[in-house]
């Protein structure tokens, strides 16, 4: 089953899943999603950025507990996106990074995320193994779901073993693209 958007509350994850949270540069995981990462997913005290346990820290506050600059947050998101892209066997659940204790708005973080995505891929897209909060969705959520499914189908096609399997996936991709085109048409009318 495909998980399209990060659940509001995450209590448990599988071994191949990573909880992505906002942290401070000191790696002091006192509250919010950082505390959840520390208590439940093995985030280490003192690690303010990167993979730590079954969690990934994105610093939204600096060492003085002030908001990081937008540029620093973009750079941290770029590092995260590149890391997720290089670790495509893992699924990353991005929480509403920075929108709690750090005080960033949903719109600010959403914009920063997609600027970082564009910097990585020269278009507004994320690797299909990154699950985002619905509020961070740049386009229509239904269109985003279909585009995510297309990315997963393309990955499966690359791993197909038999001609029959490849043909079945190819037909699913065509159906998916047809649905995307229909939805895009509905959005422009």
For each of these PLM feature ranges, what is it?
Residues 148-150, 165, 169, 178:
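Generic short amphipathic/hydrophobic targeting helices enriched at N-termini
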Residues 157, 174-189:
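Amphipathic alpha-helical coiled-coil segments
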Residues 155-168:
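Charged, low-complexity interaction regions
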